[in-house]
Amino acid sequence: MKLAILGAGCYRTHAASGITNFSRACEVAEMVGKPEIAMTHSTITMGAELKELAGVDEVVVADPVFDNQFTVIDDFAYEDVIEAHKEDPEKIMPQIREKVNEVAKELPKPPEGAIHFTHPEDLGFEITTDDREAVADADFIMTWFPKGDMQPGIIDKFIDDIKPGAIVTHACTIPTTKFYKIFEEKHGDLVTKPETLNVTSYHPGAVPEMKGQVYIAEGYASEEAINTLFELGQKARGNAYRLPAELLGPVCDMCSALTAITYAGILSYRDSVTQVLGAPAGFAQMMAKESLEQITALMEKVGIDKMEEHLDPGALLGTADSMNFGASADILPTVFEILEKRKK
């Protein structure tokens, strides 16, 4: 199998967050006995996993930065990073972040510059600056593109070089629905004829070097392609999840924090209403829908930054407390504390 990686990534944004580390990369490095994997990041980590753990025999990385300032920081011994991560990553991560931030001050941003700690060629990857060369005959095309409206222009340059039946994935910078739309608008028959192009995601849900997980979007690829990618993801990333394409953003992007709170609330509310009160599931669903729709409508009407002006958080303290039983009691006490702090 040939894997084409379009976009090598840059560590500066990972360092800037102040919370990331190399836990997954170190784990893989130890598993396969290749210390140089320990400080890989972004697509390079995922490429190394696919090569070493899933048996992908050819990996090509394309990025214009290879003709510019692709910078490898070699101040840190891989073995030292691995040992630190066995105990507490923060024993070494502050020094790494400090060095990255220092280098980033003088180095241009991608595609003119990028910060890495391992060169892809040292992992047995081929490199190129030509996306067309990379995707030629590739079975799996993993994109790692910038945000915004730049993706259609990038895709337009190589779309005619993708072989029929190939799997093309995106990560965190675009929804699957919009990613598919680009291919549909550029080359409709490519995604609608029998030998279809399989558009999906290989979304890590976090920085790849930190967590071993991947989220695969269903709806725009064949079942066979999804199964193939799911099996690769399980072997390479350790944990793989399939989900409808429209749920990928809510589950994987920054709004996942809200999704987690909302979903836990729905499930707890449902169990309290149906199991303790004995209400029909349809009634519980009707009430849940009313809650979600009206709070969403309020946010859209007045703006997320002005919601408290129109609904005092304290208004819920004297009503929701009557539902503080069953599964809801696992959540509501903490919620009440938050509402109390925010009430007018």
Swiss-Prot record:
Extract the InterPro entries matched here: 6-PGluconate_DH-like_C_sf, HMD, HMD_C, HMD_C_sf, HMD_N, METHMP_Hmd, NAD(P)-bd_dom_sf
Q: Which UniProt keywords apply?
A: Methanogenesis, One-carbon metabolism, Oxidoreductase
* Pfam families the record matches: HMD, HMD_N
EC main group: oxidoreductase
Q: Does the keyword Oxidoreductase apply?
A: yes
The GO terms describing molecular function are: N5,N10-methenyltetrahydromethanopterin hydrogenase activity
Q: Name one GO biological process term.
A: one-carbon metabolic process
Task: State whether keyword Oxidoreductase applies.
Answer: yes
Pathway involvement? One-carbon metabolism; methanogenesis from CO(2); 5,10-methylene-5,6,7,8-tetrahydromethanopterin from 5,10-methenyl-5,6,7,8-tetrahydromethanopterin (hydrogen route): step 1/1
Quote the EC number: 1.12.98.2
Report the catalytic activity: 5,10-methenyl-5,6,7,8-tetrahydromethanopterin + H2 = 5,10-methylenetetrahydromethanopterin + H(+)
Question: Matching Gene3D superfamilies, A to Z?
Answer: Hmd, C-terminal helical subdomain, NAD(P)-binding Rossmann-like Domain
Q: Which family does it belong to?
A: Belongs to the HMD family.
Q: Which NCBIfam families match?
A: hmd_TIGR (TIGR01723)
Functional note:
Catalyzes the reversible reduction of methenyl-H(4)MPT(+) to methylene-H(4)MPT.
The record ties this protein, via HAMAP family, to: HMD (MF_01090)
Q: What is this protein called?
A: 5,10-methenyltetrahydromethanopterin hydrogenase
Name of the encoding gene: hmd
